């Protein structure tokens, strides 16, 4: 009973519209404190979420539930997440091929969440989603996002956190706002394609956690991106235990 109560507290904390007071976010580095968090309709992220942004640096996405998950359950969840990731990789590979020479920064990789469960990280370069300086999805964005929405709808026991990033050009306030607006635009597109709002969350990180140097145009282009973390939801974890 105590375990379930602790899990419920973690879920409520993550689902808050402005969760900066939650313990899940206390591991943010100094620059991460400038990030903006957006609320999904229904308050989104559930038990399995907790991947670290930036490959081990930065902000916790969600709550740690620790010993509530055994090794056997972790293996079962890993099998399901591997299958979902492979399906998503195949779908998005078609987008790369169809796009030809256009900027098609699309990366699908396996990551771990804070509970050491397998999760999926999708990286989308801003050039395939938005026009420069805009938070309005471009027509080209449909090709990738429609496939991600389909994948999420086919795997209803997973949750997704959408995180927007910018380069360091311009003011911090502007970049924080733009990154959140872009994350929300992607989240709202997924909702429009039938993904339940209760499974989704959006967050803006601004120029935090760059993946390349902002000293060059190529590096800044890499830093302007949207990342989508797909993790095991509460029901998937319960079913696996």
Region roles according to the model:
Residues 97, 129-163, 191, 221, ...:
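Periplasmic peptidoglycan-binding/anchoring modules of Gram-negative envelope and division proteins
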Residues 24-91:
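Short, low-complexity, glycine-enriched hydrophobic/amphipathic alpha-helices that associate
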Residues 107-109, 119-129, 159-163, 189, ...:
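Soluble periplasmic/extracytoplasmic beta-strand elements of cell-envelope proteins
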Residues 17-21:
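C-terminal motif of bacterial Sec signal peptides marking the signal peptidase cleavage site
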Residues 82-116:
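Amphipathic, membrane-active segments
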Residues 1-11:
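Bacterial N-terminal signal peptides that target proteins for export
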């Amino acid at each position: 009973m105590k375990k379930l109560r602790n899990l419920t507290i973690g879920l409520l904390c993550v689902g808050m519209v402005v969760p900066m007071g939650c313990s899940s976010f206390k591991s943010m580095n100094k620059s991460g404190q400038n990030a903006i968090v957006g609320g999904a309709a229904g308050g989104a992220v559930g038990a399995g979420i907790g991947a670290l942004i930036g490959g081990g640096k930065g902000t916790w996405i969600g709550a740690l539930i620790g010993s509530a998950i055994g090794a056997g359950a972790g293996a079962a969840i890993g099998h399901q997440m591997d299958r979902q990731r492979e399906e998503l990789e195949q779908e998005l590979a078609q987008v790369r091929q169809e796009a030809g020479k256009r900027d098609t920064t699309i990366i699908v990789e396996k990551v771990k969440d804070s509970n050491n469960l397998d999760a999926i990280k999708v990286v989308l370069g801003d050039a395939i989603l938005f026009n420069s300086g805009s938070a309005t999805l471009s027509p080209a964005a449909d090709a990738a996002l429609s496939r991600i929405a389909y994948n999420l709808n086919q795997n209803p026991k997973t949750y997704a956190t959408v995180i927007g990033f910018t380069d360091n050009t311009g003011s911090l306030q502007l970049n924080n706002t733009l990154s959140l607006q872009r994350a929300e635009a992607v989240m709202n597109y997924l909702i429009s394609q039938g993904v339940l709002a209760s499974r989704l969350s959006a967050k803006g990180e601004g120029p935090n956690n760059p993946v390349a140097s902002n000293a060059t145009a190529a590096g800044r282009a890499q830093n302007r991106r949207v990342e989508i973390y797909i993790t095991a939801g509460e029901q998937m974890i319960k079913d696996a235990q």
